[in-house]
Amino acid sequence: MLVVGVLARFSVKAGLDTEVKQFFENGRVIVEGQPPSTNWFAFRIDQTTYGAFAAFASEDDRTALLSTGGPVSSQAHADLFTGPPTFEMVDLLEVRQP
């Protein structure tokens, strides 16, 4: 059962659509190598605001992904962003899965 998640928000520099898409494609590959992350989504909110969400069955699983996933990758690609991304830890109250 999924009980915790992480919600990340990225404010990106204008005109870097291709680079940002590649950043999230690489993020998906990282997540696929982390079995604890059972659900992962990358999305665009508007032209310069993007996000990612992942859900986990335990706090330990979430911590494992955060130690190798988004925070690490975003530091390596800081030139894409107008400032540091935010990573919010969330508790899942209800989950509907197929």
Task: Mark where each language-model region is.
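An amphipathic, aromatic/His-enriched active-site/gating alpha helix that lines ligand/cofactor pockets
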Residues: 26-39, 55-89
